[in-house]
Amino acid sequence: MTHEEFEKAAGYWKKKDAAGKKMDRGTLTAAMETYIQAHNTCALATGAGTFVRCTPIEYSWHDGAFWIFSEGGLKFFALERNKNVCLAIYDPYEGFGKLNGMQVTGTVEIVEPFCNEYLKAATFKKIPLEALMKLPSPIHLIKMTPKHIDFLSSAFQKQGFDCRQSMEF
């Protein structure tokens, strides 16, 4: 592909979104919350320089953030260097009329083990504090705060909206 072809492909959704029928923020927020709550696993993409990693991992959603407990792994190599991440939540592909998926970009912070925020997330996740305290090293808690969400759902078209909806936070 030429540079111009790459630019055209990269701008596809921006051009299409400009002409699309948008949901009001309240309706879109409710749809996003419902979709996020209906799932518990995402693909978390991290990167720094030439290093990239995409990790399938469980999450919980509350207080306007994604909360991810993790023992460790190479994602932390990137997270130390770059707090910008992207996560994807999606349904299995069953055809164009049944598309459902979400891409969330945002920033992360590593929550200090056993601080109030950590304990609240563990309680929400129903992880016993006693079990966490017995581990030889603490489980890390990643808090991902969304900055932008792109949500694709075929159901939106049935409601008279464009199938792709976006929201800035």
Residue ranges, per PLM feature:
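A short, aromatic/hydrophobic, helix- or strand-capping loop or linear motif
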Residues: 48, 90-95, 131-137
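Charged, amphipathic alpha-helical segments
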Residues: 25-29, 72, 125-127
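Helix-adjacent hinge/juxtasegments
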Residues: 75-109
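Structural motif
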Residues: 65-66, 84, 107, 148
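Charged, gly/pro-rich active-site loop segments
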Residues: 1-23, 99-169
